[in-house]
Amino acid sequence: MSHTMTPSEIVSELDKHIIGQNKAKKAVAVALRNRWRRQQVAEPLRQEITPKNILMIGPTGVGKTEIARRLAKLADAPFIKIEATKFTEVGYVGRDVDTIVRDLAEMAIKQTRESEMKKVRTKAEDAAEDRLLDVLLPPARDIGFSQPEEKDSNTRQVFRKKLREGSLDDKEIELELSAGMPSMDIMGPPGMEDMTEQIRTMFAGLGQGKKARRKMKVKEAFKLLIDEEAAKLVNDEELKHKAIANVEQNGIVFLDEIDKIASRSEIGGGEVSRQGVQRDLLPLVEGTTVSTKYGMIKTDHILFIASGAFHLSKPSDLIPELQGRFPIRVELDSLSVQDFEAILTQTDASLTKQYQALLSTESVDLVFADDGIRRLAEIAFSVNEKVENIGARRLYTVMERLLEDLSFHATKSSGETVTINAAYVDERLGDLAVNEDLSRYVL
């Protein structure tokens, strides 16, 4: 978990999935560690220490989003990734920036609920087991003798043992479960998210407490009963307080495509709305209080990580106030041939490993020779240079094209070993890589 990991440990964890980009990894690792450091500082100074937001600048496909995605798994904290382009200035058609915090709160509630339900799982399993046994063995009526009760208890123990061993899994039973209301998606006008949420909550609450009889197998029933019993053991009010505290102290927001809302001085037209989004984001980033259905949430200590390619605009095109709220700037490098090679061989779930695993299900043994990997990396790099630089994503296209025929006829090659060397790569991709017009449409 991130709060106990040192920056170097966080970086080495990210290294398993992302090649290079050490500056960005370091910045993110330090920002995560600083959350833990801040918690160790005594009040009132702790309240004054705010996170230093990060702006990642670099072309598409070099690892900006992947760093955020992997960070989400590492960070034991509410995390949300959103596209800045989805939001519009208040009053325009589109999403209001306050929904960022509401979505983050939903994420935190879900995360906290899962964590709390794990804590009470053992108790919930016992209660679910008893409810199942009550259905399988309805209690005998008391007629004044104690012996049947003893016999009943022994039978119950026998059934409990069978239940734990799984020998009753396929038996069909009928039992009463909470009847959840079907979820309703209500579309509301922009700026009226609060009212829409209240209406949705009101409809969701109509079905509470209702029961429905359902027929199912014991195995499925056991899972549903565990969830139902765990939900009873979790205190909803306490859960809300924990989730809100978690959002306020540990929340992370990843703002992708922030360059798309930067105003370019020489272009007119829709710039008002773009600047408006930036101005709406400003109070959120510098610290404000947002109303959610779970309560008021302060954004003072939420960490914001923004990223953008900045091809058509520059970070200086953002409004000065917003620029000042992202003091840590990190430039990500374009990928070289060596980087492409490393991506294909050194990452934990590399594309080569994925294709080997997929084709092994058809008994095809796929072997990648070093010269084959090198040639693939050269072709991906070359096409990026000639056509459009889409970074590591080019490897998906190249690999898919390379193995298209093999994947299609995999059943015919069952039991064979296929070696991907430079000659194999050139045979299938050589002409495409050389011909720029073909590359533009195929690769």
From Swiss-Prot:
Q: Where in the cell is it found?
A: Cytoplasm
The GO annotation for biological process reads: protein unfolding; proteolysis involved in protein catabolic process
Q: What is its main location?
A: cytoplasm
Show the Pfam families listed in the entry. AAA (PF00004), AAA_2 (PF07724)
Annotated positions binding ATP: I19, G61, V62, G63, K64, T65, E66, D256, E321, R393
The signal peptide annotation in the UniProt record is: none
Query: Record's GO cellular component, any one?
Result: HslUV protease complex
GO molecular-function term, one example from the UniProt record: peptidase activity
Q: What CDD domains does the record tag this protein with? A: RecA-like_HslU (cd19498)
Q: Which InterPro entries match?
A: AAA+_ATPase, ATP-dep_Clp_protease_ClpX, ATPase_AAA_core, Clp_ATPase_C, HslU, P-loop_NTPase
Q: Alphabetically list the UniProt keywords.
A: ATP-binding, Chaperone, Cytoplasm, Nucleotide-binding
Q: Which SUPFAM superfamilies match?
A: P-loop containing nucleoside triphosphate hydrolases (SSF52540)
Q: How does it assemble?
A: A double ring-shaped homohexamer of HslV is capped on each side by a ring-shaped HslU homohexamer. The assembly of the HslU/HslV complex is dependent on binding of ATP.
**UniProt-listed HAMAP family:** HslU
Give the record's family classification: Belongs to the ClpX chaperone family. HslU subfamily.
Q: Which NCBIfam families match?
A: hslU, PRK05201.1
Could you tell me what this protein does? ATPase subunit of a proteasome-like degradation complex; this subunit has chaperone activity. The binding of ATP and its subsequent hydrolysis by HslU are essential for unfolding of protein substrates subsequently hydrolyzed by HslV. HslU recognizes the N-terminal part of its protein substrates and unfolds these before they are guided to HslV for hydrolysis.
Protein name listed in UniProt: ATP-dependent protease ATPase subunit HslU
**Gene source species:** Cupriavidus necator (strain ATCC 17699 / DSM 428 / KCTC 22496 / NCIMB 10442 / H16 / Stanier 337)
